[in-house]
Amino acid sequence: GEERVAFTDSLGRTVQIPKELTRIAPSGSVATMILATIAPEYMVSVSATPSSAQYRYLPQNLLTLPTTGQMYGSKSTLNLETLLSCNAQLVIDLGDRKENMEQDLDALQKQIGIPVIFLEADVAHMEKMYRTLGSILSGKEARGNELADFAAETVDMAAENSAKITDEERVRVMYTSGVSG
């Protein structure tokens, strides 16, 4: 079989992942969008069919990939058959840390027989996440570092700009969503 290396994800789970990694499946919509920025040609599936509004922003190969659904959690719509037919080497979950994720991801990994990792991808972890993806995806180190540098600059710029805003200038906004979104 393929050579594997031990990888410790953001939850502290150590997972054996392929050393040469070129076939990845996103666990959901956040992972789909982020992975499309670093290695769209390595993606073997998407979580959902992109909307026509998203078409022009996405790498064209994503538009024809099979959809596997949201892979776990209360809103799980995993299409196991589709996922298994994609021949993914690794399932990547990106986003915010949630309760019981370790158990959820271990259970998913056991169910599908494919290694599953989680990387925290909120604003504070974006730089680290891109560097990590760059280091595990074959030939993607330079792209990962480029995206990580961009993420770091953006966060620094936002922090600098928000520090310049006085209390009087600060805008107060409440964002809510109703039953229909």
Residue ranges and their predicted role:
Residues L11, K19-L21, A39, S47-P50, ...:
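A mature extracytoplasmic/lumenal domain signature
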Residues R4, T14, Q103-G181:
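Extracytoplasmic substrate-binding proteins
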Residues G12, K19-Y42, I165-T176:
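A short, flexible N-terminal coil/short beta segment enriched in small residues
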Residues T14-I17, T64-N79, P115-M126:
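A structural signal for short loop-to-beta-strand junctions that line the ligand-binding cleft
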Residues A31-C86, L90-R97:
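A short, structured surface patch at a secondary-structure boundary
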Residues A25-S27, V44-S47, L90-L94, V116-E120, ...:
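Structural recognition of the beta-strand scaffold that forms the well-ordered cores
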Residues G1-E20:
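Short, low-complexity disordered leader/linker segments with a strong preference
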